[in-house]
């Protein structure tokens, strides 16, 4: 009965699980080779990361970079965030 009510009322997903699902989709697209040198989603991913991090720490959006690097069969998604001195 509880699962039926959850289905009807809609159960909210946690932010972490949503982010995990998004990253899995992004990685799946990358592995299929659908995107060229730099994927179209990187700017959107960067904007979303700035929005989420800004909820907890005030950062300059220019101090967050997202970079995808490919080496042979390895893909590395690198995210660099420069935190203000008051947080460190």
From Swiss-Prot:
Keywords: Cell cycle, Cell division. InterPro entries: MinE, MinE_sf. It comes from the Bacteria. One of its GO terms (biological process) is cell division. The keyword Hydrolase does not apply. The keyword Signal does not apply. Belongs to the MinE family. HAMAP family: MinE (MF_00262). Prevents the cell division inhibition by proteins MinC and MinD at internal division sites while permitting inhibition at polar sites. This ensures cell division at the proper site by restricting the formation of a division septum at the midpoint of the long axis of the cell. This is Cell division topological specificity factor. It comes from Verminephrobacter eiseniae (strain EF01-2). The gene is minE.
């Amino acid at each position: 009965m509880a699962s039926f009510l959850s289905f009807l009322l809609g159960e909210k997903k946690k932010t972490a699980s949503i982010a995990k699902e998004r990253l899995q989709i992004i990685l799946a697209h990358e592995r299929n080779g659908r995107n060229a040198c730099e994927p179209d989603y990187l700017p959107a991913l960067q904007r979303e990361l700035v929005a989420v991090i800004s909820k907890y720490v005030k950062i300059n959006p220019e101090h967050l970079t997202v970079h995808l690097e490919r080496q042979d069969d390895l893909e590395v998604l690198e995210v660099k965030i420069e935190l203000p001195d008051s947080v460190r």
